[in-house]
């Protein structure tokens, strides 16, 4: 398993080959916060051993950026190893997390703060995108944004069966509002990126949203949508995006012509 890489002051990233997912550790004078716990107990145990090798302190909390299995199934392993530490997530994410994970019990609707003494972590739910319950973690003093799967580097954004294609661009616009030209952005999957990368990905997602909205509004059948436009992503990345997007477009009921 790979070691941690320090990408900013006391912010370490462990990029795990399984699903190319990132586990992040943020340190402060009161301890460490782990963001996302990987896809299995075995992966979580390996991460715990690597955290010990950092020699940076004890884990005092866990954060789940959303509810997908590759980000939460190590929750129980971390909680057991560190004597019942709290797991934080949005209310939406916790409600959708596999009970076996187990789900976060410290939840919030819009924003929360974890105080590590000499630094604070801001947990913010900006809106729907990859899921209904995505959050980002901002570390202001280090100018770092942990974006979860709202941003992906090693593959196109995962527009899955529980995504919100028409909402995602606006949510990512809000995330960009939390960054500067120097911000280090850690995606849910892949290597660390910068603000420009996120801007480009947001533009691609906006193209997807606008194209779906245009096709649906013009009455193009959902089954014909993929072949009826140019898209920024390959077909297999849009398999769920098109039906999900079509379902979000309001339908105007047909009316009889006036005479």
Regions found by a protein language model. Give the residues of each.
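Conserved beta-strand hairpin/beta-sheet module of binuclear metal-dependent hydrolase folds
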Residues: 2-50, 135-148
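Metallo-beta-lactamase
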Residues: 6, 31-33, 39-41, 92-207, ...
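Divalent metal-coordination and catalytic microenvironments
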Residues: 10, 26, 36, 51, ...
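Active-site HxH/HxHxD metal-binding segment of metal-dependent hydrolases
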Residues: 45, 49-115
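Accessory terminal helices/loops
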Residues: 177, 192-259
């Amino acid at each position: 398993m790979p070691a941690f890489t320090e990408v900013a002051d006391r912010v370490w990233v462990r990029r795990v080959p399984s699903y190319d997912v990132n586990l992040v550790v943020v340190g402060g004078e009161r301890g460490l916060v782990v963001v996302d716990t990987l896809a299995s107990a075995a992966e979580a145990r390996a991460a715990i051993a690597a955290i010990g090798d950092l020699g940076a302190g004890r884990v005092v909390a866990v954060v789940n950026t959303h509810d997908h299995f590759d980000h939460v199934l190590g929750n129980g392993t971390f909680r057991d190893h560190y004597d019942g530490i709290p797991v934080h997530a949005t209310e939406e994410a916790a409600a959708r997390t596999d009970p076996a994970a187990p789900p976060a019990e410290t939840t919030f609707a819009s924003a929360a703060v974890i105080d590590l003494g000499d630094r604070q972590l801001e947990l913010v739910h900006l809106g729907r995108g990859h899921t209904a319950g995505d959050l980002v973690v901002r570390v202001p003093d280090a100018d770092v944004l942990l974006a979860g799967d709202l941003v992906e580097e090693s593959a196109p954004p995962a527009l899955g069966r529980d995504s919100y294609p028409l909402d995602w661009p606006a949510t990512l616009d809000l995330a960009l509002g939390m960054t500067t030209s120097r911000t280090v952005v850690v995606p849910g999957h892949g290597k660390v990126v910068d603000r420009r990368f996120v801007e480009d990905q947001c533009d691609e997602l906006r193209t997807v949203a606008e194209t779906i909205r245009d096709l649906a509004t013009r009455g193009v059948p959902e089954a014909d949508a993929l072949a009826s436009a140019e898209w920024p992503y390959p077909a297999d990345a849009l398999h769920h995006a098109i039906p999900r997007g079509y379902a979000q477009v309001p339908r105007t009921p047909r009316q009889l012509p006036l005479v």
